[in-house]
């Protein structure tokens, strides 16, 4: 009890210090009109910076270089003041050098490559169209919105004569996140290691904030900040038989039948929920057990998931194939491991006629603390931006994967978020059709990053140090958390 009392006291002091750490007199105005900002963002979507993951489609890197030139033309002050480094031909690193070299830098990470589109499935131009106060286009949420919002916010800060931060800030824009970031953010992270850079914190993409009634009956906005990610395991299962292949004389057991039985075992035996997972993922503390079980989004947060994603066998109706293959995908929760998942699946199948070939894997990420200064500043900024609504800011788990996997040794403090309130259809559109953001939400995203940057530190030509409103409400300390132990 005494330890818990002092821990809570420490958090109160931390919040007070944060509230007094940045400049309340700073009033940075955007230098472009609402229309200019919207059309500039629409133009950014016109560059087909597509990451193809199949060899039949060649990536058009000219589009990536055109996007570089677009940024140079749209953000002249940034390119004059910040140091730009091109990493591995196509990724971009901007260094905004701070005046205090003893402070660890802040990294604002994102990516500008996008997934392919099936144009026939789009009602609007997938490469940028403004209609009904919405900006449509691939990348409008994932993830050019963050690239453009951070650039617009910093261009505005610089234009308002706040030219040098106390703490160095890096903008890190990868070019192949949709392929795993091996040539983009992995190389940027290597650049930091070679230059002995350790970061105070990294802010990267995450899940959009959940709109009111995203979970039926829950009326608050849920601002989930990803403090850890699931891992993954992708593999191919193959069954083989040595039998006559004419359909007129079928074998007792076919390759398809053997594989189908194995897949049925896998699908009908899901992984069990991790005990006390809500202590790591505090978003789950907002709901009771029945609500979690009945909601696919919440239920997936409690366990390692299984998805049967592809199957292949046979070439003609009257020929029985001697081999059949299927691909399976698991998203591995913190508390399970790759080896555990692999062993459990092989035990379930229990058939030597089936082989497993691993095609991709990643262990679950480390967990970042929500009680660091960086997290608390992010939390206060969310309250500033969405202060007119009922907002719950909670540390949570990201079920997808980001480029942060390449930075685990650069900092312990990695926070994933998307400062846009989304509904179910917004989630569906991210890698689907008619991906969009409203003009208002885009402008708000620019303001969010402007506030976050100003809140994170004073500037060397700023006289006061009180930017965050002291009256901002801070979420109550949550005792049911692993972080309080």
UniProtKB/Swiss-Prot annotation:
Cofactor, free-text remark: Binds 2 Zn(2+) ions per subunit.
**Full protein name:** Probable carboxypeptidase S-like 1
Residues where Zn(2+) 2 binds: 111, 142, 204
Q: Which family does it belong to?
A: Belongs to the peptidase M20A family.
Provide the GO biological process annotations. Answer: proteolysis
EC no. given is 3.4.17.-
Show the active-site residues. 113, 177
Compartment(s):
Secreted
Where is it found, in Gene Ontology cellular component terms?
extracellular region
Signal peptide positions on this chain: 1-21
Q: By its UniProt entry, which PANTHER family does this protein fall under?
A: N-FATTY-ACYL-AMINO ACID SYNTHASE/HYDROLASE PM20D1, N-FATTY-ACYL-AMINO ACID SYNTHASE_HYDROLASE PM20D1
Q: Which CDD domains does the UniProt entry name for this protein?
A: M20_yscS (cd05674)
Q: Which cofactor does it need?
A: Zn(2+)
Provide the GO MF annotations for this entry. metal ion binding; peptidase activity
What keywords does the record list, in alphabetical order? Hydrolase, Metal-binding, Protease, Secreted, Signal, Zinc
Query: What Pfam families does this protein map onto?
Result: M20_dimer, Peptidase_M20
Q: Where does Zn(2+) 1 bind?
A: 142, 178, 431
């Amino acid at each position: 009890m005494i330890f818990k009392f002092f821990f809570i006291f420490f958090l109160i002091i931390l919040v007070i210090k944060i509230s007094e750490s940045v400049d309340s007199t700073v009033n940075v105005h955007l230098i472009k009109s609402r229309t200019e900002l919207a059309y500039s963002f629409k133009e950014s979507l016109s560059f087909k910076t597509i990451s193809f993951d199949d060899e039949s489609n060649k990536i058009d890197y000219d589009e990536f270089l055109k996007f570089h030139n677009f940024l140079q033309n749209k953000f002249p002050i940034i390119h004059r003041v910040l140091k730009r480094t091109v990493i591995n031909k196509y990724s971009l690193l901007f260094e905004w050098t701070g005046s205090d070299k003893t402070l660890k830098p802040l990294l604002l990470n994102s990516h500008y490559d996008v997934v392919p589109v099936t144009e026939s499935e789009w009602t609007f131009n997938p490469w940028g169209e403004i209609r009904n106060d919405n900006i449509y286009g691939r990348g409008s949420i994932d993830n050019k919105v963050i690239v453009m919002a951070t650039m617009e916010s910093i261009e505005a800060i610089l234009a308002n004569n706040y030219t040098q931060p106390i703490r160095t800030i890096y903008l890190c824009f990868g070019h192949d996140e949709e392929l795993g970031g091996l040539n983009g953010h992995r190389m940027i992270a290597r650049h930091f290691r070679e230059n002995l850079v350790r970061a105070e914190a990294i802010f990267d993409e995450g899940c959009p904030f959940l709109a009111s009634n995203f979970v039926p009956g829950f009326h608050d906005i849920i601002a989930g900040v990803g403090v850890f990610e699931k891992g993954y395991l992708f593999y191919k299962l193959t069954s083989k038989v040595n039998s006559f292949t004419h359909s007129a004389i079928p074998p007792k057991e076919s390759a398809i039948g053997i594989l189908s039985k194995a897949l049925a075992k896998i699908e009908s035996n899901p992984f069990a929920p991790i005990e006390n997972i809500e202590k790591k993922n505090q978003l789950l503390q907002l709901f009771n057990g029945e609500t979690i079980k009945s909601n696919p989004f919440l239920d997936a947060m409690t366990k390692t998931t299984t998805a049967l994603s592809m199957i292949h066998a046979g070439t003609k109706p009257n020929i029985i194939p001697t081999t059949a293959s299927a691909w399976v995908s698991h998203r591995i929760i913190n508390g399970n491991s790759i080896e555990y998942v692999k062993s459990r699946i092989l035990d379930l199948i229990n058939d030597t006629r089936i082989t497993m070939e691993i095609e991709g894997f990643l262990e679950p990420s480390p967990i970042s603390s929500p009680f660091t200064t960086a997290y608390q500043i992010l939390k206060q900024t969310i309250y500033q931006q969405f202060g007119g609504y009922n907002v719950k800011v909670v540390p949570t788990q990201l079920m997808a994967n980001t480029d942060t996997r390449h930075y685990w040794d650069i900092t312990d403090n990695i926070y994933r978020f998307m400062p846009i309130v989304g509904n179910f259809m917004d989630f569906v559109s991210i890698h689907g059709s008619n991906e969009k953001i409203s003009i208002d939400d885009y402008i708000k995203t620019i303001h969010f990053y402007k506030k976050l940057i100003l809140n994170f530190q004073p500037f060397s030509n700023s006289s006061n140090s009180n930017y965050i409103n002291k009256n901002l409400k801070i979420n109550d300390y949550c005792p049911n958390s692993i972080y309080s132990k």
